[in-house]
Amino acid sequence: MGKDTIADIITSIRNADMNKKGTVRIASTNITENIVKILLREGFIENVRKHQEGNKYFLVSTLRHRKTRKRIHRTILKRISRPGLRIYSDYQQIPKILGGIGIVILSTYPRYNDRS
């Protein structure tokens, strides 16, 4: 059974929010780097840097705080499709999140990509 790195990212960010931590340390893989880039671009994360300990790489992410309170800016993170329950959807059925102000991160299977 493999590790679920996407669930690890979401859980780390949620736990940091509950404990009012400012930074999150995530194991660095191609998928985690791509997801963290999206979260950075969309404003969930304020800053990211790559850190090395021995032969392992980590992403150290600084979470965005609100100006008035010391709480994380946005904390509603959910994983819909997971290894035990895959969700497949037509492009017309992708839901709007939080009335259109949230984001959906999705991946496409390379075989179904229109550039192949």
From Swiss-Prot:
The keyword Oxidoreductase does not apply. GO terms for cellular component: chloroplast; ribonucleoprotein complex; ribosome. It holds the Pfam family Ribosomal_S8. Keywords: Chloroplast, Plastid, Ribonucleoprotein, Ribosomal protein, RNA-binding, rRNA-binding. It is found in: Plastid, Chloroplast. One of its GO terms (molecular function) is rRNA binding. Part of the 30S ribosomal subunit. One of the primary rRNA binding proteins, it binds directly to 16S rRNA central domain where it helps coordinate assembly of the platform of the 30S subunit. This is Small ribosomal subunit protein uS8c. It comes from Musa acuminata (Banana). The lineage of its organism: Eukaryota, Viridiplantae, Streptophyta, Embryophyta, Tracheophyta.
